[in-house]
UniProtKB/Swiss-Prot annotation:
One of its GO terms (molecular function) is structural constituent of ribosome. Belongs to the bacterial ribosomal protein bL27 family. The keyword Cytoplasm does not apply. Pfam families: Ribosomal_L27. This is Large ribosomal subunit protein bL27m. GO terms for cellular component: mitochondrial inner membrane; mitochondrial large ribosomal subunit. One of its GO terms (biological process) is translation. Residues 1-30 form a transit peptide. Keywords: Mitochondrion, Ribonucleoprotein, Ribosomal protein, Transit peptide. InterPro entries: Ribosomal_bL27. The lineage of its organism: Eukaryota, Metazoa, Chordata, Craniata, Vertebrata. Its main location: mitochondrion. Component of the mitochondrial ribosome large subunit (39S) which comprises a 16S rRNA and about 50 distinct proteins.
Length: 148
């Protein structure tokens, strides 16, 4: 009889270990909503700022015409070309637009340009694009005294 009681107790202990408790059967999950995350990439659908060249090579321009708009220096002002406060290039005189690639030697007072030049390899030459306006009328004409 003692053996039967021991077997019955171990069987009920094993069943109690394997079967889930009754309290878990009564637990109910209610509807819930997760909190929304924040979006990081706002403003990606804004239109472009329309930077770029306004007058191409060979175009005739009047004084004050905008030649190019830029955010950073992509084109540098050359002869008869002014630089606006927002880095736009404009014509100072009437004439024809010309673009050239020239060797760029920055002034020693410009620390950013000096840092760039010091990082270049030995013997490297720095070229930049310059915008010029060739005046339509000659600036100064002179005659030799012998021709008078």
């Amino acid at each position: 009889m003692a053996l039967a009681v021991l077997a019955w107790r171990t069987r009920t202990a094993v069943i109690a270990l394997l079967s889930p408790p009754q309290a878990a059967a009564l637990a109910v999950r209610y509807a819930s909503k997760k909190t929304g995350g924040s979006s990081k990439n706002l403003g990606g659908k804004s239109p472009g700022k329309r930077f770029g060249i306004r007058k191409m090579e060979g175009h005739y321009v009047h004084a004050g015409n905008i030649l190019a708009t830029q955010r950073h220096f992509r084109w540098h002002p050359g002869a008869h070309v002014g630089l606006g406060k927002n880095k736009c290039l404009y014509a100072l005189e009437e004439g024809v637009v010309r673009y050239t690639k020239e060797v760029y030697v920055p002034s020693p007072s410009n620390s950013e340009a000096v840092d760039l030049v010091t990082r270049l390899p030995e013997g490297a030459v720095l070229y930049k694009t310059f915008v010029h306006v060739v005046p339509a009328k000659p600036e100064g004409t002179f005659k030799l005294v012998a021709m008078l």
